[in-house]
């Protein structure tokens, strides 16, 4: 599966709840396109998930759900490696080595930790604090060239680049010079950032207590229509220019979803609906969502009834990841001087 002529892409999704439209447009849809021209590893990052407490039964179920969605959305196990992070122990081993490379000051600057910890900083897990080091290990273990990232992960990838450079410098006299390639970000289009259906200023999230805030893969057609019909909007007609969207976050969100699903430019969608009321637009958006989600939902139903197949795909991905990571960890341990 590994092809040295192709650039290596690594990315992952946390199994922390029901995946939704935001995960699809913001990540998984891009994964499907990337596998055609890249050497892709798509991980279910369960070690990242437990930096915040997870119900063990739910975690096991969610892992299989993410695997199902990867496949149902179009990730091809013949073109990409799909595996569970914790089944490849070298992720944790390399994370510890990188813990010893990373400077405390670097971690202190990570804004996502500050946001997630909030005022309860003294009581959150140390795993949440060192989360970026594990992310760096995920990426560097496979000598990744490209990492798809959104706004919330850009800083972590910058840290990964710093860690890789420091490792190369620290061990330059011991075979480590230029050992890790410095991974580049694959910046996702802003239009792929999907916001809550109830508040256009907040990201669509699994953790939002309101199920009406998101479109989930297992929503039936009637529920999709209901969620879109009740999605928050403003009383004005749809605008005619992108500049008009700056102060209309809910309109911007729904139009951007339409743009991403249809493959049309946002300005073209605006031209089609300029001056119209939201009622007709919401009907058309619902139809478009159903056309995209229904085939995935039907495939999910089939996969849910074939857990043996899912486990075989994950085992195949784990074997590929182990083969590759065994080689890299042997070299890393030799460079560092570990037994």
Positions of PLM-derived features:
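Internal, conserved structured core segments that host functional sites
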Residues: 115-171, 196
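N-terminal Rossmann-like or analogous alpha/beta NTP/dinucleotide-binding catalytic cores
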Residues: 2-10, 15-137, 301
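Conserved nucleotide- and phosphate/pyrophosphate-binding catalytic cores
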Residues: 23, 161-339
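A generic secondary-structure signal for well-formed alpha-helical elements
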Residues: 67, 74, 102-105, 144, ...
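Short helix-capping/linker segments at secondary-structure and domain boundaries
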Residues: 104-108, 141-148, 259-269, 297
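Short, solvent-exposed beta-strand edge segments and adjacent coil->beta transition regions
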Residues: 16, 144, 210-212
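Catalytic-loop motifs flanking and including active-site residues across diverse enzymes
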Residues: 94, 129, 156, 224, ...
